[in-house]
Amino acid sequence: CIYPKLAPQPLKEDYLLTGELEPTNEPYAIAKIAGIKLCDAYRSQYGCNFISVMPTNLYGIHDNFHDQNSHVIPALIQRIHSAKISDQKQVEIWGTGQAKREFLYVDDMASACIHVMNAPFAQYQQMTVTQPHLNIGTGEEVTIQELAQLICEVVEYHGELIFNDQKPDGTPRKVLDISRLHRLGWQHQISLKKGLAQTYSWYLNHQGRLRTV
């Protein structure tokens, strides 16, 4: 969300502050950008080896599974699981299902952060000459329809998915360029289907103790 609304895809680090932000996310984006710039200023002024990274959409264990306020993956897991146990024949999903998104499992996020912190700081500086942060993601995109179908496979739900095209899709495509991170020697390890399976298993084992705020 820190990148301009109309920035080219995939989103390169260099696109930061090159255009107007998405209005609905602007305060959130400005807060993140301020954090990146503050770390950069401390690094310049005081010589602190601060590192800034910008992740793509994260998911995994300990996520927020609130039925109204959660992000797309926990929301779909909760909704499709509920449909399965209540024997609902259909699940409605907002939008056409054709919007494309990128998702990173939380353990891969932690792995990437550790990798970047352990890399020689001179390498990080070489990668961040034009902008003081690195993107973290998979570089792989999936449509919301494909995501929902994967979750149905993991949950073993055999009903029908109904896409309500009267509801908004949001940004048609959102994927990060992670070529700099790859040049630094890091690759994600957890496939989307494996990550979804681990997340659903955790969800099942923590009924009654889920974060729902």
Predicted regions located by residue number:
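Glycine-rich, phosphate-binding/catalytic loops in enzymes
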Residues: P10-D14, N69-H71, A110, C152-V154
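Proline-centered helix-kink/hinge sites
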Residues: T24-P27, P55, P74, P168, ...
